[in-house]
Amino acid sequence: MLRTMFHAKIHRATVTQADLHYVGSVTVDQDLLDAADILPGELVSIVDVTNGARLETYTIAGERGSGVLGINGAAAHLVHPGDIVILIAYGQMDDDEARHFQPKVVHVDADNRIVELGIDPADGLLDGLSRPPLSREWNEAQAEL
């Protein structure tokens, strides 16, 4: 049996643009996609922390280092510039892999710059709180990419 498991998330990113007339998808800074191990074209769920909307779409690589997170197409009715969102990707794994897999958690600041990489799906890094024990400092994790 294959299990569908959380494999990556970009946590609390800020939507930088929305284009209702684009054909669809979400445009994400290539640096964020790389850090989360999410491929262009990969299915992602978007959870809008600001208004509670949830949707599924696919990713398009945005300009590296730009901080872009653009909502495209009909989803622009639900998610707006300035909204805080979580992008979640899932993967199918056999039972053994699912029990031992460590996902990638990418924490970003208000400008969508990476501030922390982690492996704990329950990480909820918020300003002013200490780092969760399973997360790693950015420089240490970056060296492994």
From Swiss-Prot:
* Primary localisation category: cytoplasm
List its EC numbers: 4.1.1.11
Disulfide bond residue pairs: none
Listed binding positions for substrate are T57, G73, A74, A75
> What subcellular compartments does it reside in?
Cytoplasm
Q: Residues in the active site?
A: S25, Y58
A GO term for molecular function: aspartate 1-decarboxylase activity
Q: Which Pfam families match?
A: Asp_decarbox
Q: Annotated pathway, please?
A: Cofactor biosynthesis; (R)-pantothenate biosynthesis; beta-alanine from L-aspartate: step 1/1
Q: How is it modified after translation?
A: Is synthesized initially as an inactive proenzyme, which is activated by self-cleavage at a specific serine bond to produce a beta-subunit with a hydroxyl group at its C-terminus and an alpha-subunit with a pyruvoyl group at its N-terminus.
Q: Which residues carry this modification: Pyruvic acid (Ser)?
A: S25
Superkingdom as given in the UniProt entry: Bacteria
Provide one Gene Ontology cellular component.
cytosol
Cofactors (names): pyruvate
Q: Which Gene3D superfamilies would you find in this protein's record?
A: 2.40.40.20
Q: Give the record's GO biological process terms.
A: alanine biosynthetic process; pantothenate biosynthetic process
Recorded catalytic reaction(s): these are: L-aspartate + H(+) = beta-alanine + CO2
What top-level class of enzyme does the UniProt entry assign?
lyase
Per UniProt, subunit arrangement is: Heterooctamer of four alpha and four beta subunits.
PANTHER family noted in UniProt: ASPARTATE 1-DECARBOXYLASE
Q: What is the role of this chain?
A: Catalyzes the pyruvoyl-dependent decarboxylation of aspartate to produce beta-alanine.
- Protein name according to UniProt: Aspartate 1-decarboxylase
Which organism does this sequence originate in?
A: Micrococcus luteus (strain ATCC 4698 / DSM 20030 / JCM 1464 / CCM 169 / CCUG 5858 / IAM 1056 / NBRC 3333 / NCIMB 9278 / NCTC 2665 / VKM Ac-2230)
Classification lineage: Bacteria, Bacillati, Actinomycetota, Actinomycetes, Micrococcales
